[in-house]
Every structure is written in structure tokens, then in C-alpha cells.
Amino acid sequence: AVPCGQVSSALSPCMSYLTGGGDDPEARCCAGV
């Protein structure tokens, strides 16, 4: 299992994209996921 803190830190750069606020995911989002 992956620790929740690690998941949230990996997904935090993606949140605006995942919630429809960004056109493209950030590069660090793709690298983290």
C-alpha cells in the first residue's frame, strides 16, 4: 500500500487539472503519477 501522504503529495500538482481548472496536467503531475 502507498501512504496517503505520498499520494496527496503526488497528486497535489494535478488537482486543478483533475477538477477541470487546468487545460493540461503539469509535467510534475505526470512524473508523480
UniProtKB/Swiss-Prot annotation:
Cysteine pairings via disulfide bonds: C14-C29
Identify the InterPro entries for this entry. Answer: Bifun_inhib/LTP/seed_sf, Bifunc_inhib/LTP/seed_store, Plant_nsLTP
Q: Which UniProt keywords apply?
A: Antibiotic, Antimicrobial, Disulfide bond, Lipid-binding, Transport
Question: Can you supply a Gene Ontology BP term from the record?
Answer: defense response to bacterium
Per the record's keyword annotation, is Transferase included, yes or no? no
Q: Which GO terms describe its molecular function?
A: lipid binding
Outline the subunit composition. Dimer.
**What is the similarity comment for this entry?**
Belongs to the plant LTP family.
This chain's function reads: Plant non-specific lipid-transfer proteins transfer phospholipids as well as galactolipids across membranes. May play a role in wax or cutin deposition in the cell walls of expanding epidermal cells and certain secretory tissues. Has antibacterial activity against Gram-positive bacteria S.aureus and S.epidermidis and blocks biofilm formation. In a mouse model, also protects against bacterial sepsis and has an anti-inflammatory effect. Exhibits antinociceptive activity upon oral or intraperitoneal application in mice.
Which named protein is this?
Non-specific lipid-transfer protein
